Amino acid sequence: MSKGQSLQDPFLNALRRERVPVSVYLVNGIKLQGTIESFDQFVVLLRNTVSQMVYKHAISTVVPARNVKVGPGGGYVQSGEGGQAGDEADE
């Protein structure tokens, strides 16, 4: 597993498990909102009034509506503008 995914998967999984509302900004500037229903190596399934399959290569930023604890002993990822990831932790 690459270093980039050692935080990505636990982060997305925590958002999915806790049903945290997220704003997903795409590289073209479009903002999508909803909850993460599922994800894999290439796509994120975002649910609002409908489900949207969004390719990860099109995603610029994922902003949770509240702080999310990543992994069992991991740090928190802060919500809002300028949030920073906490300590990395694998599940």
UniProtKB/Swiss-Prot annotation:
Species for this entry: Stenotrophomonas maltophilia (strain K279a)
Stretches assigned to the Sm domain: 9-68
Taxonomy of the source species: Bacteria, Pseudomonadati, Pseudomonadota, Gammaproteobacteria, Lysobacterales
GO CC terms of this entry: cytosol
Assembly description: Homohexamer.
Gene3D superfamilies, per database record: 2.30.30.100
UniProt cross-references to CDD domains, sorted A to Z: Hfq
Protein name: RNA-binding protein Hfq
One GO process term, biological-process aspect: regulation of RNA stability
Family: Belongs to the Hfq family.
Function field: RNA chaperone that binds small regulatory RNA (sRNAs) and mRNAs to facilitate mRNA translational regulation in response to envelope stress, environmental stress and changes in metabolite concentrations. Also binds with high specificity to tRNAs.
